[in-house]
Regions:
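Short Pro-Gly-centered beta-turn/loop motif in secreted/extracellular proteins
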Residues: 345-366
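Structured interaction patches on ligand/partner-binding surfaces of diverse proteins
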Residues: 363-390, 474-479
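Secondary-structure boundary elements
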Residues: 3, 7-189
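Hydrophobic/aromatic-rich core segments of domains that either
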Residues: 1-2, 148-166, 174-184, 189-284
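Aromatic, loop-rich ligand-recognition surfaces of beta-strand-rich domains
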Residues: 390-511
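A short, amphipathic beta-strand motif
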Residues: 306-316, 397
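Short amphipathic beta-strand segments in non-cytosolic proteins
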Residues: 321-340, 417-419
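Beta-strand-rich domain onsets/edges
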Residues: 278-306
Length: 511
């Protein structure tokens, strides 16, 4: 870090020289952690922040079409990259070290928190590549009314729950791809997706002395996307407790499960995990996400240690350079989430979620062995096709509906679909959705021929979804297969026509 600091090396050295007590080790850790850390800033990000502050609008916390176009233009603007080691000041690091030290020594629940965990869960001055800010005091002032309650609290999980109850939601909006937002921007405008929600939780918890981190899956076996959540160190049994600020509050309930299949789980770290990176040292063409130095494999904390040894097809020509990876099915193919060690013509995988189908793959995702499942009892089942026996099946769904999918399905409960001869009515129910649909579509076959020219979709009470009823498309067809569609137009003012035409009519074009 001192070499990377160049002309700023004096600032980093000043931090080290400031301490001659236990804080010296924290200072060494913080200085070392500046290695490779950067902030990404620019006029485009400033404009994105201004855009977030225009919400909520008529679409609640979602952008309208004009805002989204602006946001994507801003997000594509060039960014400036500044290295922490070359720019951070001694005062900034020292203030962070002193504050984290005070909370480590002062909170009841931190009395047995090991120093290595303290350095990763209380000490960090940053989360990702956000602009650096002095965030600890503003967050503590925001949560100041909780201080007396927290002072009496002896359990870190309970302290986390108290803070979560005060924080409220981070309003969901995942339409823009940007660097991490700054701590103060998240405090002022809590908007984003799971990343922003987790970042905001980290700042709040650490400002009050609660040891927390972020765990993540790089690729979801359920939907192919990534996801992250928070964990809090439980001082009662010295283990991590996962929680989701919005849906699953911190709890010591050992039966807690968020219903997501995960495959492999990594923890975001403050200092780089060089031991994990060493496994990829000789491999060629490693997927970039696996070379993130600030990830640590913590799958065993969730599922225990396990091991699977599978045969590799001879044609794969596997070697340390042409490495084999653990593949989870995501995005219509198996994709790498961890590297294997080779044992002759076999690949050895360790620490994975049981009862999930994996496949050995090469760096490009090409399968190099039969898919397999490691069961809870440690037994291994390989899916070897029997070409002498065939059976036809009808596949309607690869996975059971996940949390978000169930939420979207249930959002339409209470919706009426009606017809009328005029735009003013009288309206007649064609269908009332009283239970969540089993699929992402609903087909309505009227008992009698329709005589009304107008259709209306509405809910007489607020639907259960975050944004009301979530309906993406509306078709009126002459046939039952949805091939012979009738032309539709939207009745209403300009705003209604703009919004609902985009959402409901599949042939609508912006051009």
């Amino acid at each position: 870090a001192l070499r990377q600091a160049a002309d700023n090396a004096g600032e980093l050295q000043a931090v080290l020289d400031r301490y001659d007590d236990e804080r010296r080790e924290l200072a060494e850790y913080a200085v070392a952690a500046t290695w490779g850390r950067v902030a990404r800033t620019g006029a485009g990000m400033d404009s994105v922040e201004a855009l977030y502050r225009e919400l909520p609008g008529i679409y609640k916390w979602q952008f309208d079409s004009a805002q989204l176009a602006r946001g994507r233009r801003y997000a594509a603007m060039p960014l400036s990259v500044t290295k922490d080691a070359a720019t951070v000041t001694a005062d900034y690091l020292a203030d962070n070290i002193d504050d984290a030290w005070r909370l480590w020594k002062g909170r009841q629940w931190n009395r047995e928190l090991p120093q290595d965990l303290m350095c990763e869960m209380l000490l960090p001055y940053r989360v990702g590549d956000e602009p650096l800010t002095r965030w600890r005091k503003p967050y503590r002032e925001w949560l100041a009314k909780l201080e007396d309650t927290l002072a009496r609290c002896g359990n870190s999980v309970e302290a986390a729950r108290i803070i979560v109850d005060r924080m409220g939601l981070c309003h969901y909006n995942d339409r823009l791809s940007t660097p991490h937002r700054s701590a103060l921007d998240l405090l002022e405008a809590p908007i984003g997706y799971c990343r922003e929600d987790c970042d905001r939780v980290l700042y709040a918890m650490r400002s009050m002395g609660v040891p927390v981190a972020v765990d993540r899956m790089l690729l979801s076996p359920d939907n192919g996307g990534s996801h992250q959540w928070n964990v809090v160190w439980d001082n009662m049994d010295r283990r991590m407790r996962m929680f989701d600020n919005e849906n699953y509050p911190p709890t010591r309930d050992s039966l807690y499960y968020d219903r997501r299949r995960k495959g492999k789980i990594y923890r975001s770290t403050f200092a780089p995990d060089l031991d994990r990176l060493a496994r990829y040292r000789k491999a060629v063409g490693v997927p970039p996400m696996l070379l993130n130095p600030w990830l640590r494999d913590v799958t065993a904390e969730y599922f225990g240690h396990n091991r699977a040894e599978v045969a590799i097809w001879p044609g794969a020509k596997a070697s340390e350079e042409n490495a084999v990876y653990l593949g989870v099915f995501a995005g219509q193919r198996f994709q790498p989430v961890d590297i294997a060690s080779l044992k002759g013509d076999r690949a050895v995988f360790t620490d994975m979620e049981p009862n999930l189908i994996y496949a050995p793959v090469m760096a490009d995702g090409k399968i190099c062995g039969y898919p397999f499942m490691l069961r809870h009892d440690g037994s291994l089942h390989s899916f070897v096709p029997d070409k002498g026996s065939y059976e036809k099946v009808t596949l309607t769904r690869k996975f059971t509906p996940g949390y978000h999918q169930k939420s979207r399905f249930s959002s339409v409960v209470g919706v009426h679909v009606q017809s009328a001869p005029t735009a003013r009515g009288p309206w007649t129910d064609l269908d009332v959705i009283d239970t969540p649909p089993a699929h992402s579509y609903r087909r309505i076959n009227p008992d009698n021929p329709l005589t009304g020219r107008y259709l209306r979709v509405y809910a007489d009470t607020m639907c259960k979804g975050k944004y009301g009823a979530e309906i993406s498309m509306l078709l009126a067809c002459r046939d039952t297969l949805g091939l012979d569609c009738l032309p539709l137009s939207v009745v209403g003012d300009d705003a209604a026509r703009e919004r609902y035409t985009r959402i409901l009519l599949p042939d609508y074009s912006l051009e």
